[in-house]
Amino acid sequence: MIRTVDIYDTPMIGVFATCTEDVVLVPTGTKPETCAILEDSLDARIVETLVNGSVVIGALSRGNSNGFLYSYGTDAGEMKELTGVEAEILPGKLNAVGNIVLANDSAALVHPELSDKAIEVIASTLKVEVYRGTIAGIKNVGMAGVVTNKGLLVHPKVTASEIETLEKLFELPVNIGTTNFGTQMLGSGLLANSKNYLAGSDTTGPELGRIEEALGFLE
């Protein structure tokens, strides 16, 4: 089984791509063989696109089975057509969506300084409960963790009170880990849904083991 991959010849796959149960958004120009690995491993449809003209799709978008949120400047209508689910632009200055929203199909943890209006848009688009918070004191929660409908993996320096909040919000046990040989902002190097995962190519065997345990892939 293939467990690691690069996108644009970099292991920072969570910066360049994002996925849900049904869709993997990858930047235009991703190698066909990479697309094939992503599609096969995650059992989800590949959509090649740009977000606001940029290739860092993972940093600028976040979705679940109900919808996707995108940064300012994205054509929401076009994205809705491409993905087949709701598409909205996150309002306000803080809108590198993938960096600041951590979400699955039941809940979302978001940057603590997001406006009430932004919270409303997230809740209505993703159809989830939304809570402001941090992970390891970091406000960019979207890259400080990875959550699926089966598991939750976060930054190693997460605090006890943050763990309590995360477990209550997502109703999943919290596990800690890293990707790409010690990267604590592990979301930058991991794509996962409830069916499978792929990590960046620098991710070590022990790191892969933690990912598999946290996200429920151990037999």
Curated annotation (Swiss-Prot):
Instruction: Tell me if Membrane is a UniProt keyword of this record.
Output: no
One Gene Ontology biological process? cytosolic ribosome assembly
Record's InterPro entries? eIF6
> Which controlled-vocabulary keywords does the entry list?
Initiation factor, Protein biosynthesis
Gene3D superfamilies according to UniProt: L-arginine/glycine Amidinotransferase, Chain A
Give the GO molecular function terms.
Answer: ribosome binding; translation initiation factor activity
* PANTHER family in the cross-refs: TRANSLATION INITIATION FACTOR 6
Which purpose does this protein serve, as stated in its record? Binds to the 50S ribosomal subunit and prevents its association with the 30S ribosomal subunit to form the 70S initiation complex.
Assigned protein family = Belongs to the eIF-6 family.
Question: What protein does this entry describe?
Answer: Translation initiation factor 6
